[in-house]
């Protein structure tokens, strides 16, 4: 069976800091290609959103991922924060669409479950597991670790989906 190497970009959107993590995945193995944070300037929101879109698009053009994964919006008590997060997420989705990149979405609970094995894991636990799973020299910053965790979650989830489809095909 052929297991091609796939490149996945994970995106953890934020209006001030957007984390990104780019991994390769082949079969049950994954490795880190790049990770970091897009720290927006202290401009008005529209300029920050444009910066997020532009920098993510540049990363996509440089690293040529096959797929993207992003965290779903979760419920906030502060409506303004939720709105800004949704707008940052929209800027990230525009960048992926501009590069014709398919996008998968995962809840925070799904991501933590896939990476830590516990859906209510702390940020520190996610950082630690990303550090271990990708054999990084040191733990990445929280936003980048979250983005790498999103990419790892997608690698695992999509691999399991492929196996289920193959098994279903053998049953019919």
From Swiss-Prot:
Its EC number is 3.1.21.10. It catalyses: Endonucleolytic cleavage at a junction such as a reciprocal single-stranded crossover between two homologous DNA duplexes (Holliday junction). Mg(2+) 1 binds at residues 12, 143. Its main location: cytoplasm. Disulfide bonds: none annotated. InterPro entries: RNaseH-like_sf (IPR012337), RNaseH_sf (IPR036397), X-over_junc_endoDNase_Mg_BS (IPR020563), X-over_junc_endoDNase_RuvC (IPR002176). It is found in: Cytoplasm. Mg(2+) 2 binds at residue 71. One of its GO terms (biological process) is DNA recombination. This is Crossover junction endodeoxyribonuclease RuvC. It comes from Coxiella burnetii (strain Dugway 5J108-111).
